[in-house]
Every structure is written in structure tokens, then in C-alpha cells.
From Swiss-Prot:
Role summary: May play a role in signal transduction pathways that involve calcium as a second messenger.
Residues involved in Ca(2+) 3 binding: 469, 471, 473, 475, 480
This protein's record includes keyword Ribonucleoprotein: no
Gene that produces this protein: CPK26
Organism: Oryza sativa subsp. japonica
Similarity section: Belongs to the protein kinase superfamily. Ser/Thr protein kinase family. CDPK subfamily.
Name the UniProt record assigns to this protein: Calcium-dependent protein kinase 26
BP terms from Gene Ontology: intracellular signal transduction
GO function term, MF aspect, one: calmodulin binding
């Protein structure tokens, strides 16, 4: 993500609000007064945002107005007139973030540049416009990244905002080496406070995750800042939204059902709390569809390690935030008043198990590398391999029902000579059964078995390794990893060192093929056959 998040993409695009309910109100432009400020319209948060934006535009330049930009709908202006653009800080689906310096004051800021050519349709344009409106609307709140200005030229939109030089939340937790429940409660208190502010100001974030919370500086007391409002929306009481947006682990069940409101943000924070305390997400799987199926089931594990060592108050809050019924879920205000989260509350000041930190580090640092490698492997599968899996499905589906039961799967895999333990087959079944109906249809089977197959095939792993090993030296260096992740749109400057360190078992500063294979197979069922609950805990996604 870098110093300033660069925006996420929608998993599935749909109508913003339920037909028959009001959509997020279009902003009403303020009427400019003589001094260039704008009169605020009292009707909506969007109007306030638009008025602030209009005022900024009116006062930003005294030169003749340029042509009107199609995204921000105001005169285009060159950002480099005011700022010097420096090194790259991060990269996302729609944009790149650079360090920038205000030419007059020397202040260091972050400039998020969004290429207009990547805004493929009106919805994408509306998203960027709304992001600017929302950030202006939330401007001045102490724990939200401050937008200093928005600029549009012929090719790009530039958002200039506070520079959060302290890095991501995960990085701070890991760097400290240990933390207590009380520290986790303080962290959650800050996050929920931010969301309470957003909700009270008529904004749903819709993409809450640890990566979207940054620290303003490297100081121990640096304030936490929420960022990346690219998926956020204005909302009114009772308004229902239907488009599926967000990041897989953190999406609320009602979002997947296309009928949700601000309660979805509380679910996402509940997932974050679970990760802060246990080091792994509560709902995991080998594919996005399987993650969604687990979320819809809503069964959270509060029995396996390290949960027996965690206080009853923490577990009570997790349950109430991850209540599958949004109407019964706590509000942000209620979370802030829970005994565990209060400043002088019940959270014990006892260090959490070190394994939690290790898991946090794995989940944070290895995610993008493994994701990139899996993408490469999936792309190198031949038609012949896919055809073989189709035939395998037919052979396992003995009653020709078009679906496979657990018993059919066990018998069929054994006859195919595939060496999986019962625990591994049950894991495969659960991961493959995306709709949670207890059986696997053809599409579910192919998706799941392609993954298990490719993890067990040396040639696929080697193909992926070669993709990263750009100079064919037999090693993946830091520079090669950076290049490959940039090509995949997964680059994060902050995590490269952690990725190398975690995979580099012989500590020579680079990753050889055996280390790459070990990293890829860790937690996949190929490296070790263990208790399924333990395997779940050690899985690196």
C-alpha cells in the first residue's frame, strides 16, 4: 500500500442503492461568494463536500480558468505548478502514490495519481469524484488522512494528502515484538472511534482492513490515520446498498447478500480484532469463493490456540461484532462502550503469545508474494491438465449426479492415486464447497483441485519461480521480487524485506528454489499433515 493507499477495486459492481430507496445523494454545488468561499448547502454531507471542494478550487489559482475536467468537473490544473513530485511510495489498481513537496513551504506530502485511462466507465469516474467529496467532507477529523487538494489534468487526477511516514498498522505491531490485550483494546478503540466519526457524518467506509490504517510518523505516540476512501459512500438512515465491494477476508455476510448498511463496517473491524488477537483471519480458504462461503456460514473458532489464553471479555466483543445478523450486531457507539475496550476497562495487561505475532507477520508479509505466485501458476496450466481434471470429476461422480459427496471424493482420490489424508480431503471439501451445501459441483471441483494439484507439481512451482527469477540466476533477489510484484500490481515497498526474511531460511539475503517451494507449500497440505485446526492456524494465504 505504501505511505498512502492507492485505492481498491470492486469485487462485483452493482447498483449503489436498492431500487425504491434513495441512492447516495448527488452533491449540490455551493454558490460562490465574493471572497471565493462557498456557501454550504445544509441538505447533505455530499453538499458540504462539494462546497469545500469548490472553495478550494476557487482559491487555488488566480490565473484564467482552464478547461473543465470530466472527473472533478472543475477547471483543470497542473499539480506540478504547486508541488514537486518525488519517489514512488506505493501502487494500486487505479493509481500510484508518490512523495511530493509543496514548493512554497517545503512540506512533505503524498500525491496519489489516478490515470484517467483506467477509469473505464461512468461508475469509475463517479467513484473517484465521490472519494474526493468524502475526503473533503471528513477533512479536519484528527484520525482521518487530510486531503490538501485535488487536481485534474488531461491524463490524470491527483489527490494530495497528508504523508503518513509511520507506515502501516501491522508494521508497528510486528516491530514492537509483543503486545498485550490492553494494547489491542487501545488500538481497536482508535479504529472504532474513526468509524463512529464516519458513520455519524453519514459515510460508510466499505473497505476497512489493517492496511488502510497508517501512522502519521514513526514516533511511539504517532496518531493512527484512516485512509483509502475509494470505495466509501454517503448514506442516509435506512438506505440499503447492493454492490459487493471490499477485501475478501473483511467482507460482511450481508454485503455478499447484496443488502447492507453501516453495520458492514463493524463486521470488518470485528475481523480485524480477531486478527489482532489470534494472528489469523476468522474466515479463510484457498479461493475467494470459499472465503465468501465461510463468511456466510459465520462460524468463528474461539476454542483453538491462542483463544484459551485470551480473556472472556475479548471473546465476548468478538462474538458481538461478528454477529451474522447485522440488526443484532453492535453499533460503533456500543463497541466503544463495551467493558473490554474502555480505556480503564477489562482488557488484561498480559503479553499475548509470541505465536500470534509470528502469525501476524506471516499473514501480513507473505500474502502478496504467494498471491502473485499462485496467479502465475494458474496461468501456466495447460488445456490437457484441465481436461484431466474434468475426467477426474466424471470418474469420482459415480452416480452421475453432477455433484460429489465427501465419501465419493475420498474414494475417488484414493483410486486416482492422489495421496491426501482424511483431514486434507475434508479441508479440500470445505474449501471447494463454495456454497456450503455439503456437496461439490463441477465448477467448485475444478477450482479447488487445480489448486491442490499445482501445489504438488514441481514443474508448476518451477515455472512460477522462473517468473520471479528474472536473470535466471537460480535466486530471487529483492530487486526481482519488487519488479515482479509491480508487474502483478501487488507491490508494497514496506513488505519486501519481510518477505525475503521470512522465506530466506539460510539467511543469504535471497530466495533459492527450495526456499520458494517450502514457502509455497507451507500450510497447503503438501508440506505437513497435521490436526486440521492447527493447519488452519498456520496457513499462509
Amino acid at each position: 500500500m505504501g505511505q498512502c493507499c492507492t485505492g481498491g477495486g470492486k469485487a462485483v459492481a452493482g447498483d449503489e442503492a436498492e431500487p425504491g430507496t434513495s441512492k447516495a445523494a448527488p452533491p449540490s454545488r455551493g454558490t460562490s461568494s465574493k471572497n471565493g468561499s462557498a456557501k454550504q448547502q445544509p441538505c447533505s454531507p455530499a453538499a458540504k463536500a462539494a462546497a469545500t471542494e469548490a472553495a478550494a478550487a476557487a482559491s487555488s489559482s488566480k490565473k484564467p480558468a482552464g478547461p473543465i475536467g470530466e472527473v472533478l468537473e472543475r477547471p483543470m490544473e497542473e499539480v506540478r505548478t504547486t508541488y514537486s513530485i518525488g519517489k514512488e511510495l506505493g501502487r494500486g489498481q487505479f493509481g500510484v502514490t508518490h512523495l511530493c513537496t509543496h514548493k512554497a513551504t517545503g512540506e512533505k506530502l503524498a500525491c496519489k495519481t489516478i490515470a484517467k485511462r483506467k477509469l473505464a466507465n461512468k461508475e469509475d469516474v463517479d467513484d473517484v469524484r465521490r472519494e474526493v467529496q468524502i475526503m473533503h467532507h471528513l477533512s479536519g477529523q484528527p484520525n482521518i488522512v487530510d486531503l490538501r487538494g485535488a487536481y485534474e489534468d488531461k491524463h490524470n487526477v491527483h489527490l494530495v494528502m497528508e504523508l503518513c511516514a509511520g507506515g502501516e498498522l501491522f508494521d508497528r505491531i510486528i516491530a514492537r515484538g509483543h503486545y498485550t490485550e490492553r494494547a489491542a483494546a487501545a488500538l481497536l478503540r482508535a479504529i472504532v472511534g474513526i468509524v463512529h466519526t464516519c458513520h455519524s457524518m453519514g459515510v460508510i467506509h466499505r473497505d476497512l482492513k489493517p492496511e488502510n490504517f497508517l501512522l502519521l510518523s514513526k514516533g511511539d505516540d504517532a496518531p493512527l490515520k484512516a485512509t483509502d476512501f475509494g470505495l466509501s459512500v454517503f448514506f442516509k438512515e435506512g438506505e440499503v446498498f447492493r454492490d459487493i465491494v471490499g477485501s475478501a477476508y473483511y467482507i460482511a455476510p450481508e454485503v455478499l447478500k447484496r443488502k447492507y448498511g453501516p453495520e458492514a463496517d463493524i463486521w470488518s473491524i470485528g475481523v480485524m480484532l480477531y486478527i489482532f488477537l489470534a494472528g489469523v483471519p476468522p474466515f479463510w480458504a484457498e479461493s475467494e469463493n470459499a472465503i465468501f462461503a465461510a463468511i456466510l456460514r459465520g462460524q468463528i473458532d474461539l476454542a483453538s490456540e491462542p483463544w484459551p489464553k485470551i480473556s472472556s471479555g475479548a471473546k465476548d466483543l468478538v462474538r458481538k461484532m461478528l454477529n451474522i445478523n447485522p440488526k443484532e450486531r453492535l453499533t460503533a457507539f456500543q463497541v466503544l462502550n463495551h467493558p473490554w475496550i474502555k480505556e480503564d476497562g477489562d482488557a488484561p495487561d498480559v503479553p499475548l503469545d509470541n505465536v500470534v505475532l509470528n502469525r501476524l507477520k506471516q499473514f501480513r508479509a507473505m500474502n502478496q508474494f504467494k498471491k502473485a505466485a499462485l496467479r502465475i501458476i494458474a496461468g501456466c496450466l495447460s488445456e490437457e491438465e484441465i481436461k484431466g481434471l474434468k475426467e477426474m470429476f466424471k470418474n469420482i461422480d459415480k452416480d452421475n449426479s453432477g455433484t460429489i459427496t465427501l465419501e465419493e471424493l475420498k474414494n475417488g482420490l484414493a483410486k486416482q492415486g492422489t495421496k491426501f489424508s482424511d483431514n486434507e480431503i475434508e479441508q479440500l471439501m470445505e474449501a471447494a464447497d463454495a456454497d456450503g451445501n455439503g456437496i461439490i459441483d463441477y465448477e467448485e471441483f475444478v477450482t479447488a483441485t487445480v489448486h491442490m494439484n499445482k501445489m504438488d507439481r514441481e514443474e508448476h512451482l518451477y515455472t512460477a519461480f522462473q517468473y520471479f527469477d528474472k536473470d535466471n540466476s537460480g535466486y530471487i533477489t529483492k530487486e526481482e521480487l519488487e519488479q515482479a510484484l509491480k508487474e502483478q500490481g501487488l507491490y508494497d515497498a514496506n513488505e519486501i524485506k519481510d518477505v525475503i526474511t521470512d522465506a530466506d531460511s539460510n539467511n543469504d539475503g535471497r530466495i533459492d528454489y527450495s526456499e520458494f517451494v517450502a514457502m509455497m507449500r507451507k500450510g497447503s497440505g503438501c508440506a505437513e499433515a497435521t490436526n486440521p485446526k492447527k493447519k488452519r492456524r498456520d496457513l499462509v494465504l
